[in-house]
Swiss-Prot record:
Database matches in NCBIfam families: branching_enzym, PRK05402.1, PRK12313.1
Listed InterPro entries: A-amylase/branching_C, Branching_enzy, GlgB, GlgB_N, GlgB_N_E_set_prok, Glyco_hydro_13_cat_dom, Glyco_hydro_13_N, Glyco_hydro_b
An example molecular function term from Gene Ontology annotations: cation binding
Keyword entries, A-Z: Carbohydrate metabolism, Glycogen biosynthesis, Glycogen metabolism, Glycosyltransferase, Transferase
Gene designation per UniProt: glgB1
GO CC terms: cytosol
UniProt-listed Enzyme Commission number(s): 2.4.1.18
GO biological process, one term: glycogen biosynthetic process
Protein name as catalogued: 1,4-alpha-glucan branching enzyme GlgB 1
Gene3D superfamilies, sorted: Glycosidases, Golgi alpha-mannosidase II, Immunoglobulins
Reactions mediated catalytically: Transfers a segment of a (1->4)-alpha-D-glucan chain to a primary hydroxy group in a similar glucan chain
Stated role: Catalyzes the formation of the alpha-1,6-glucosidic linkages in glycogen by scission of a 1,4-alpha-linked oligosaccharide from growing alpha-1,4-glucan chains and the subsequent attachment of the oligosaccharide to the alpha-1,6 position.
Length: 732
């Protein structure tokens, strides 16, 4: 109940302050706005462009009408020395009662600011960004952004008509963080930051680097996220994840692009629709994991997510952050792990993003020899800056902890490790010892992987690293980078080149098939047939295979049989599992209609069966990283383009014999030495009729004869199907 209305005369406004406020240049709004002590009480100043009148409503109900100042939107009045107040603002469209943003003290704790400055705040989005909070009984949103070289920062949004004069922020000087609590702003509000550089020049409005939600492209605003925690139902998965993802467990990864896996009438599915269709398919196909191409927010869909700007926000292209959480949750409930591609190497130059964020090279290197990547027209993160490396590590933790993601595949690691990557002499800056290694990135990756192991046990870190940099998967304590796995790019390049050759020439390239075993145990590897191999004019996996249709499909089936029995975890890009004949196009859905063709359906059936074989037999996965788990039986038959090897599991596990004929010639009576006699069972044959083959094989059973061969006391007389892979297991 109001007890009365008083009018008071405000203190005089300084003309310089008026001009700075009106031009959105004043860098210390808290020194002017809000209530400030005077000799007789307090003076209250507000700047609300567009307001027609403003009153202060005191805690006792008394209302004090503020006087309009010399500039439209300026209002001031005298208040008693003690007591709280609210603002009653008369806008052209009606009245608003609200708390004054400039009545609140500093928001972030000194400890938070210290952690941010040191790059040690692992829950960075709980401090920076937009967080819905309650302060002194008032509900609103705390905005905070790191911009140490800015001379002024304001938050603009749909709650203040995107007016940079309305909500200038407070600088916490020791950290370079600007903050402001804005009452009554809640989830769903769209916002950006309007900054001025160190010399006062206005910068393009910036999206929040730490926003947990972003506007759907082509919009570029950040959105205040709902603070309600997602209610997870994957306790069983999380409790067993470390065992499921141990080095001796099977890992078969289905790599996919969420926007083009399945399109209904040309429309992308949201996370829930994708889960409805994808999860049953992946489970039926026998993959243990899905790997999503980057889901962090990115402005250009044609980058496939590899040029992200919103490293804390799942892209809005497929729904809300909770939608992404539901997708992961549903995968886990069906026993499927989720790996996400993550890009800490570089970022695009879009004006609303991180580029020259506060008018200086803040996130990137200032020197283009270090900070600009010509191949991708992107800017390179300065991993040597504590706040930047901390920002990236916190992004990784956000997805691993908040979204229960089971692993990150770190993109473009080689481009980070070497200062001369894709640069000519004179175009790069050596390290302090004159070398090419990027010591700052090495330190960043080691710290990242050590923290992931410490704080998210059971999660895996996978490096896309294409060079011979030593110790990528070695422990940090032993001088390594600390990744769990590394993509085996050498295996992929060699074997795809071999498979693309006309069989008549393969005898001259036999080493491309066998060389991978020379270094197979130097790292812990994933065998990647990824999206990179079916784009940019390379053709599809099926399209790389030589010969007529029969030979191409047989080649593909044999190659997949080789891949799934070779040491190393498996990764197969979507569409390859049924022999997509054309390159992948992110603007189109996969050609699922091809499954009406028995040849394509046969490839799909083969992948389903070989996945189950891989999981069922420990010999095919338990010793991927141990030389005792592999033995050549026939590695030198270049003339016949045949390889044969034994895969061995732990003590008590049955060995598995793999034989592959990479020529279109049937091999009759091909003898293979084996470690024991009796009847060996043919458990897989890529030439089976169900896969689209000619059903040439060994009838399911082959009896080993007592004959010394290949270092063994027994031998199997085999029929090797043309362009075929067979797998046999011993008796017992």
């Amino acid at each position: 109940m109001m007890s009365g209305v008083m009018t008071a005369v405000s203190n005089r406004w300084d003309p310089g302050v008026i001009r700075a406020l009106a031009e959105a240049r004043h860098g210390d709004a808290f020194a002017v706005l809000g209530a400030h002590r005077t000799d007789t009480g307090r003076v209250l100043r507000t700047y609300l462009p567009g307001a027609e009148r403003v009153s202060a409503v005191l805690d006792d109900g008394q209302t004090i009408a503020l006087e309009a100042g010399p500039e439209p939107g300026l209002f001031a009045g005298d208040l008693p020395a003690q007591g709280g107040y609210r603002l009653r603002i008369g806008w052209p469209g009606g009245e608003q009662d609200t708390a004054d943003p400039y009545a609140f003290g500093p928001q972030l704790s000194d400890f938070d600011l210290h952690l941010i400055s040191e790059g040690h705040h692992l829950q960075l989005a709980d401090a920076l960004g937009a967080n819905v909070v309650e302060v002194d009984g008032v509900r609103g949103t705390r905005f905070a952004v790191w911009a140490p070289n800015a001379s002024r920062v304001a938050v603009v949004g749909d709650f203040n008509s995107w007016d940079a004069r309305r909500h200038p922020m407070r600088l916490r000087h020791q950290s370079g963080v600007w903050e402001l609590f804005v009452p009554d702003v809640g989830p769903g509000a769209h916002y950006k930051y309007q900054l001025r550089g160190p010399h006062g020049h206005e910068l393009p409005a910036k999206a929040d680097p730490v926003a947990r939600r972003a506007e759907l492209a082509p919009g570029t605003a950040s959105i205040v996220a709902d603070p309600t925690p997602y209610q997870w139902s994957d306790d069983g998965w999380m409790a067993t994840r470390a065992r499921r993802q141990a080095h001796d467990a099977p890992m078969s990864v289905y790599e996919m692009h969420a926007g083009s896996w399945l399109r209904e009438e040309g429309v992308d599915l949201d996370w829930d629709g994708l889960a409805d269709h994808l999860i049953p398919y992946v489970a039926d196909m026998g993959f243990t994991h899905v790997e999503l191409m980057p889901v962090t927010e990115h402005p250009f869909g044609g980058s496939w997510g590899y040029q992200p700007l919103g490293l804390f926000a799942p892209t809005a292209r497929f729904g809300t952050p909770d939608g992404f959480a539901r997708f992961v949750d549903r995968c886990h409930r069906e026993g499927i792990g989720v790996i996400v591609d993550w890009v800490p190497a570089h970022f695009p130059t879009d004006a609303h993003g991180l580029a020259h964020f506060d008018g200086t090279a803040l996130y990137e290197h200032a020197d283009p020899r270090e900070g600009f990547h010509r191949d991708w027209n992107t800017l390179i993160y300065n991993h040597g800056r504590r706040e930047v490396s901390g920002f990236l590590i916190a992004s990784a933790m956000e997805f691993l902890q908040r979204y229960h993601v089971d692993g990150l595949r770190v993109d473009a690691v080689a481009s980070m490790l070497y200062r001369d990557y894709s640069r000519n002499a004179g175009e790069w800056v050596p390290n302090i010892h004159g070398g090419r290694e990027n010591y700052e990135t090495i330190a960043f990756l080691r710290r990242l992987n050590a923290l992931v192991r410490e704080h998210t046990p059971g999660a895996v870190m996978i490096a896309e690293e294409s060079t011979a940099f030593p110790g990528v998967t070695a422990d940090v304590a032993h001088g390594g980078l600390g990744f769990h796995y590394k993509w085996n790019m050498g295996w992929m390049h060699d074997t795809l080149h071999y498979a693309s050759l006309d069989p008549i020439y393969r005898r001259y390239h036999h080493g491309e098939l066998t060389f991978s075993m020379v270094y197979a145990y130097s790292e812990r590897f994933v065998l990647p047939i990824s999206h990179d191999e079916v784009v940019h004019g390379k053709g599809s996996l099926l399209g790389r295979m030589p010969g007529d249709d029969w030979q191409r499909f047989a080649n593909l089936r044999a190659y997949l049989g080789f891949m799934f029995t070779h040491p190393g975890r498996k990764l197969l890009f979507m569409g390859c599992e049924f022999g997509q004949p054309t390159e992948w196009n992110h603007d189109s859905g996969l050609p699922w209609h091809l499954l009406d063709d028995p040849r394509h359906r046969g490839v799909q059936t083969l992948v389903r069966d070989v996945n189950r074989l891989y999981v069922q037999y420990p010999a095919l996965h338990a010793h991927d990283d141990d030389p005792s788990g592999f033995a050549w039986v026939v590695g030198d038959d270049a003339g016949n383009s045949v390889v044969a090897f034994l895969r061995k599991g732990k003590r008590g596990d049955a060995p598995v014999l793999v034989v592959i004929n990479f020529t279109p010639v049937v091999q009759h009576g091909y003898r293979i030495g084996v470690p024991q006699g009796g009847q060996w069972r043919e458990v897989f044959n890529s030439d089976a009729g169900i896969y689209g083959g000619a059903n040439l094989g060994n009838g399911g059973i082959v009896t080993a004869e007592q004959q010394s061969m290949h270092g063994h006391a027994h031998a199997l007389p085999l029929l090797l199907p043309p362009l075929g892979a067979i797998v046999l297991t011993p008796p017992g």
